[in-house]
C-alpha cells in the first residue's frame, strides 16, 4: 500500500498533517516492513495544527482539529478521529491559512537524522532558528562541537548568550534558552 501511495504522490509532494506525529508513524511503519529507504529523511512537512496556532492563537497554541473546524465555521459533516475524515478536515483548515504563513513555517521530522555534516539542516523561522545536526555517539561529543553547541539570534544571526544551559526536552532533542546581546 505504501508503494502505491508514494507512487500516487509523484516526484514533487509535501505532507500536510494535523500535529507532529503522523510522519514519524509513517516512517516507523515503513521501517518495520523494510521500506524506509523509499522515504529519505529528514522529512520536511507542514504541520497544519502548528500553522493554524501561529495564525489564530495568541501564543501559537495547539488546538484540536474539531476546535479549529468550529472556529473557522466549517460544517461538521462526519465524525472526527477517522483517517480520511480528519485528512479532509485538515485540508479544509489548510485552505484557510495565509500562504505566506504556510511557506515560512514548515516542520522537519527527524526520525531519520542527518548522517553527516553535509546533510545537517539549518532553518531560520520568523521567531526562532532550528538546527538539525548529524547524529553523535554520545552527549560529550555533541557538547564539544562548537558549531552544534552554539546559539544564534534568529533576527540578526549574531551569537546569542545562553540564559539556560542545554537540556533534554525528550529523548531525541536538546534545547537551550538564549538571548541576543544587541
Where are these regions (language model features)?
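Metal-dependent phosphoesterase core characteristic of DEDDh/y 3'-5' exonuclease domains
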Residues: 6-135
Amino acid at each position: 500500500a505504501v508503494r502505491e501511495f508514494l507512487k500516487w504522490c509523484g516526484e514533487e509532494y509535501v505532507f500536510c498533517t494535523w500535529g507532529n506525529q503522523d510522519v514519524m508513524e509513517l516512517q516507523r511503519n515503513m521501517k518495520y516492513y523494510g521500506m524506509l529507504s523509499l522515504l529519505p529523511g529528514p522529512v520536511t512537512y507542514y504541520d497544519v495544527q502548528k500553522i493554524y496556532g501561529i495564525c489564530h492563537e495568541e501564543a501559537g497554541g495547539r488546538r484540536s482539529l474539531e476546535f479549529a473546524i468550529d472556529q473557522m465555521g466549517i460544517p461538521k459533516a462526519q465524525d472526527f478521529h477517522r483517517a480520511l475524515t480528519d485528512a479532509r478536515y485538515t485540508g479544509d483548515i489548510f485552505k484557510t491559512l495565509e500562504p505566506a504563513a504556510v511557506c515560512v513555517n514548515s516542520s522537519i521530522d527527524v526520525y531519520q537524522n542527518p548522517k553527516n555534516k553535509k546533510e545537517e539542516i539549518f532553518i531560520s523561522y520568523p521567531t526562532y532558528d532550528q538546527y538539525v545536526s548529524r547524529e553523535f555517539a554520545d552527549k560529550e561529543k555533541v557538547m564539544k562541537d562548537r558549531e552544534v553547541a552554539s546559539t544564534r539570534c534568529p533576527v540578526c544571526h549574531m551569537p546569542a548568550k545562553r540564559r539556560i544551559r542545554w537540556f533534554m526536552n525528550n529523548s531525541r532533542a536538546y534545547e537551550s534558552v538564549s538571548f541576543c546581546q544587541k
